[in-house]
Amino acid sequence: MERGGYGGGSGQGYNNFAVPPPNYQQMPNKTGNYNEPPPNYGKQGGGYDSGSGHRGSGGSGNGGGGGGSWNDRGGNSYGNGGASKDSYNKGHGGYSGGGGGGGGGGGGGSGGNDMITQEDTIFVSGMDPSTTEQDIETHFGAIGIIKKDKRTMKPKIWLYKNKETGASKGEATVTYDDTNAAQSAIEWFDGRDFNGNAIKVSLAQRQNNWNKGGGGGGGGGGRGGFGGRRGGGGGGGGGGGGGGRFDRGGGGGGGRYDRGGGGGGGGGGGNVQPRDGDWKCNSCNNTNFAWRNECNRCKTPKGDDEGSSGGGGGGGYGGGGGGGGYDRGNDRGSGGGGYHNRDRGGNSQGGGGGGGGGGGYSRFNDNNGGGRGGRGGGGGNRRDGGPMRNDGGMRSRPY
């Protein structure tokens, strides 16, 4: 038998060759089942086939575990992505012949919950809930000039309220004309009494939305098995890479017996959750608070399009791999699935493996986008499966 998936050489993962081989006198002799998945190039890969006919262990780190298989059914494969987001790729092998290997683990997303300190803005907490914006302006305006909003010409004071009840939380931000006034406000008002409450005053912070790169692309689907009455089903599609802040995608579709493997999934979501109602400017890609009616950067009025999510890949039927998802909000799609059986799979029932997921990208910095996922494996090529044609060849992108 051929052992299941294996990963890179360093780290915690290793190939365990201490498992005794199966007793070939106690199980049927299947010939031609060379179901060896392609190597995973991620670090700390692991996983092996114990010879029990079940799935190989999932690899740790960046590489996904390979699908171990013998007899009639291919094993499952679980691949964990690295960094801040886990990709979950599960590739089912085919029935009635050799099973397809699972897809490799997707790459992790870059970026994190980085916070930027606003040197000209203070955050005030612990106030009495009955405090109004006028009270705040009078009290904190005594130490320096409060900045005016250019559109409304009102002081830049934001009073935080409960979204359900509309009641004040006793917290607010105040933006001054210069940073020295903000520092002076902290020194003068922090810990002091305001309307009967001792308040806390510090520099305000906000999320860093401008340098978040997308996650890496998912691994390619496994190769379909040889032999049997029909060609083995194609491996499952690779998992999608991490997307930007508002991009979320589905996982790759698994293969099905004597059918084509599923397409690669859409990009995984970033780890920064937008607030309810936040919207993205169609002109400069700036993310604005829900209460703004125009972009605070380029002054473009608020539009209806706030970005869309990448769709998941569909499972293939009749030999063809399913199509990958796409992002409706822009021109960057996720990885497509395998083409029809004439291009990627067998001529008859041996379906092609799904393509890897497209790499995510940052809406705010296009240079930090993730890499494209791996290619899907070919279909089975014995008897009804038919020979493969143009397997693994490059094709023009549909976007």
Swiss-Prot record:
User: Per the similarity annotation, which family is this?
Assistant: Belongs to the RRM TET family.
Major localisation: nucleus
Tell me a Gene Ontology molecular-function term this record carries.
mRNA binding
Where is this chain compositionally biased, Gly residues type? 1-12, 43-69, 212-271, 308-339, 347-361, 368-380
Residue stretches of biased makeup (Polar residues): 24-34
CDD domains with a match to the protein in the record: RRM_SARFH (cd12534)
Kindly indicate whether the keyword Zinc-finger belongs to this entry: yes
Q: What does this protein do?
A: May participate in a function common to the expression of most genes transcribed by RNA polymerase II.
GO BP annotation list = adult locomotory behavior; compound eye development; larval locomotory behavior; mRNA splicing, via spliceosome; positive regulation of synaptic assembly at neuromuscular junction; regulation of DNA-templated transcription; synaptic assembly at neuromuscular junction; transcription initiation at RNA polymerase II promoter
Ranges annotated as RanBP2-type zinc finger: 275-304
Q: Name one GO cellular component term.
A: catalytic step 2 spliceosome
Q: Quote the subcellular location field of this record.
A: Nucleus
Miscellaneous note, as given in the UniProt record, is: 'Cabeza' means 'head' in Spanish.
- Name-wise, this protein is RNA-binding protein cabeza
**Which residues lie in coiled coils?**
none
Q: Which gene encodes it?
A: caz
